[in-house]
Amino acid sequence: MSNINKILDPNSRMVSGPLNVVRLEGNFYGIKKVLYLFMDYHADVSDQTQCENIFSEDVQKYFAKTFYKLNDSNKIYDFFLEVFPTEIAQDIYSDDVPEIDHKEMYIEEVVKLFKKLFRYDPKKNRVLMNNITKNIRLHYIDIRDYYKNNVHNRTADMNIIARNFMVKGNIKVSQLNKIIKLMKIIRNHLEEIVEILEYSPKNNKSQRSKIIKTRDYDDLDIQTIEYLARKIKSTYKYQDVKKIMNMLLQQSIDNFKSTIKNIDESIKIFTNYAKQISESTDKLVRDPNTSYVYVYGLSPYTIRNMIVDIANRVDKIMDEQLIEFFARFTDIFFLRRFLDKDYITNGIIYTGALHSNTYINVLVKYFDFKVTHFSYSKISNPQLLTSEIKKRSLMEIQELILPNSFGQCSDMNSFPKEFQ
């Protein structure tokens, strides 16, 4: 078939949105489980790409039509989405529904679909099925909202300040002190979370906490966090699932402790920078970074070194590390539910690619799931791909399943129809 025919083929199943789609299949305690993983890359709308086939569909439309077709199926399908339960709650308790919808990034369009289909009984604290898609159970999985609190907003504030230092080529001590203050707040949050996650109560039974609710953006919801911690630590049917999930959880705890140490080190360094700048302003100081040796105030070279160090530390500790570590809570929450619940047999999940990478790693390496289909793989044979995944570390798997060139289009022509 020529390239033109591929573009015009009305039977082609091309889906705009995911970088890749992978189908896994496993037999878990005699129960056949199938999982479709749709891998998103959170690109801004202006940077998004799409399939060239004129009949291709955006992923949310593909889901909506396929979910509706599954009304005739004799199976129940479970759709998992990277969405905060608190975000769902904002719409449930709001009467402000816009008449006109604006196009957003692919994952946000899927979130909109999820919200439109979502049904919830707040009195019984139970998610209900929608009659329009009567064979689809909806699951939120992004519980990190309760753990990370408003850490994201605070890290964003610190990044803005650090970038302003870089643009202006100067450091305002008052703004540097603001970064230090924000770091201390985040550090305290992390210590509280570690304490909760490490605590092992003698009685693992606890009152069920309502998860789908609006939240306070300043204080940690201790009751909800403790409830979620007990679930992902202790509440399991299968002990091997519990063992692996607790291994992943311990890795996150260790990483948080390491991050706390890095924050302490950064606070100490930044406090020293603030002191040096304050004490040297309009004063004759010895600065070995300038050929003049003695200057009034610190030299531009010394200030630039400080700025680069501040920006790098804020990016590494507060952005890269915390985003990755908090993401693990979402992963553990999903994997526990998918594996430990016998009634979940046909799963579909739409998340960021790094989440999918974790699911593939854990399910293949520890629970003997097999890759059966994919839109893209560096290795063309599914059996060989499965074997190679078992040999590689979590991060090294990305090379195998992420396309070399960025493109938000997945070819599903080789996949079984309707998530079989």
From Swiss-Prot:
It is found in: Virion. Its main location: virion. Keywords: Virion. GO terms for cellular component: virion component. Belongs to the mimivirus R160 family. This is Uncharacterized protein R706.
